[in-house]
């Protein structure tokens, strides 16, 4: 009798371990979509701009080639100031319809939203023996305290470069490393008055 009871108990345990190995679906949240959107060219960076709410602001773009600022840079995205009415600013990049431009987007909460294009420069990709457009973006860590009438960099958009020493095309490292090595980049930011 004890053998039958023991065998029955073991079979029940084996059956229960099979039940424990089922796969269940999880609720899909926005965090599931973010890596997929990034892979398709959507990038977004959100900033708390509550410290300058109510101030007059301009959006600025600075372009650099081989470490030197381009002659007509910096430039305003709009030819006027506007009053910042919101606490949040989102800068982002959207998939472009062609390789030679990047489509940028910004949205200042309760204030203004727009998009514009940045012209890109080709990079010779030695490993592929061809010219390509290859860029990446990342946010700056905003500095404190914020100063009036001073450019505040928020996001950089930098091209990859060929690293001859390691025989690889790359765009990695700290922001200061990338800015030293990238042959072409933009810095997007704001000024307040």
Regions found by a protein language model. Give the residues of each.
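Hydrophobic residues positioned within well-ordered beta-strands of beta-sheet architectures
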Residues: 45, 59, 186-188
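Structured domain cores in non-transmembrane regions
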Residues: 53-127
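Bacterial Sec-dependent N-terminal signal peptides
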Residues: 1-25
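Short edge beta-strand/loop segments characteristic of extracellular beta-sandwich folds
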Residues: 46-50
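Short, surface-exposed loop/turn motifs at beta-strand boundaries within globular domains
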Residues: 37-42, 52-54, 183
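Extracytoplasmic electrostatic interaction patches
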Residues: 104-193
């Amino acid at each position: 009798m004890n053998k039958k009871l023991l065998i029955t108990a073991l079979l029940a345990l084996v059956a229960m371990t099979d039940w424990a190995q089922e796969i269940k679906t999880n609720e899909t949240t926005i965090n599931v979509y973010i890596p997929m959107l990034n892979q398709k060219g959507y990038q977004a960076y959100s900033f708390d701009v509550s410290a300058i709410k109510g101030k007059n602001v301009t959006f600025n773009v600075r372009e650099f080639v081989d470490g030197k600022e381009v002659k007509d840079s910096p430039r305003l995205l709009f030819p006027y100031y506007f009053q910042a009415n919101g606490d949040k600013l989102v800068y982002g990049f959207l998939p472009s319809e062609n390789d030679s431009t990047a489509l940028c987007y910004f949205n200042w909460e309760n204030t203004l939203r727009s998009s514009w294009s940045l012209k890109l420069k080709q990079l010779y990709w030695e490993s592929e023996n061809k010219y390509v457009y290859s860029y990446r973006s990342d946010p700056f860590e905003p500095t404190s305290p914020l100063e009036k009438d001073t450019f505040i960099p928020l996001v950089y958009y930098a091209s990859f470069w060929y690293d001859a020493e390691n025989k690889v095309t790359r765009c990695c490292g700290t922001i200061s490393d990338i800015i030293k090595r990238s042959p072409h980049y933009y810095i997007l930011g704001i000024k307040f008055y």
